[in-house]
């Protein structure tokens, strides 16, 4: 599969003690090939529960190409949790803490009773996903499914234990000796 092939060959950047993998799906660089995006979207559709979903939800930034592609395939509109406040009526702010940053995310466009599928590029610490789930619950949405393309670290387990929601992923990885390893 192209996703796994490109992960195995992607560059690794060390910041402090953490090794970041740089990949088109997680970073948008060096280039996002349509065939990779198509493969990822098709695989998400195969494992996801989109039946009756009224909205797809992601956080900016790298979930945006994923939900755009999925929206075109499924005809389900999408909502992006943004990093800046718009002060629209009903906007829900939520604190987000990840392995590399802390800040607010803002949810707009979700109505009570919406049936949503959450899509994200990577789950590693779980901080972004916990923030998304919290905001959606506060908005009164029903979470139908949660799908992340790449799983790294303990974030999936942390989110599942903390929220009770199961998270589906396409591939689980680690970085060992300066290379991505598929687990």
From Swiss-Prot:
The keyword Transferase applies. Its main location: cytoplasm. It catalyses: IMP + diphosphate = hypoxanthine + 5-phospho-alpha-D-ribose 1-diphosphate; GMP + diphosphate = guanine + 5-phospho-alpha-D-ribose 1-diphosphate. Pathway: Purine metabolism; IMP biosynthesis via salvage pathway; IMP from hypoxanthine: step 1/1. GO terms for molecular function: guanine phosphoribosyltransferase activity; hypoxanthine phosphoribosyltransferase activity. GO terms for cellular component: cytoplasm. Keywords: Cytoplasm, Glycosyltransferase, Purine salvage, Transferase. Its EC number is 2.4.2.8. GO terms for biological process: IMP salvage; purine ribonucleoside salvage. Pfam families: Pribosyltran. The keyword Glycosyltransferase applies. CDD domains: PRTases_typeI. It comes from the Archaea. It is found in: Cytoplasm. Belongs to the purine/pyrimidine phosphoribosyltransferase family. Archaeal HPRT subfamily. Homodimer. Catalyzes a salvage reaction resulting in the formation of IMP that is energically less costly than de novo synthesis. This is Hypoxanthine/guanine phosphoribosyltransferase. The lineage of its organism: Archaea, Methanobacteriati, Methanobacteriota, Methanomada group, Methanococci.
């Amino acid at each position: 599969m192209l996703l796994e092939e490109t992960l195995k060959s992607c560059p690794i950047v060390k910041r402090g003690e953490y090794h970041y993998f740089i990949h088109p799906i997680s970073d948008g660089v060096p280039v996002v090939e349509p065939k990779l995006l198509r493969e990822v979207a098709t695989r998400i559709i195969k494992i996801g529960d989109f039946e009756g979903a009224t909205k797809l939800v992601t956080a900016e930034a790298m979930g945006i190409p994923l939900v755009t592609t999925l929206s075109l395939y499924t005809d389900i509109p999408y909502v992006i949790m943004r990093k800046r406040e718009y002060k629209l009526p009903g906007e829900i702010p939520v604190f987000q803490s990840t392995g590399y940053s802390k800040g607010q995310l803002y949810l707009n466009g979700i109505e009570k009773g919406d049936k949503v599928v959450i899509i994200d590029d990577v789950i590693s610490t779980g901080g972004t996903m916990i923030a998304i789930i919290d905001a959606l619950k506060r908005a009164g949405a029903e979470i139908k499914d949660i799908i992340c393309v790449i799983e790294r670290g303990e974030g999936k387990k942390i989110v599942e234990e903390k929220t009770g929601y199961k998270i589906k992923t396409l591939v689980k990885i680690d970085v060992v000796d300066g290379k991505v390893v598929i687990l």
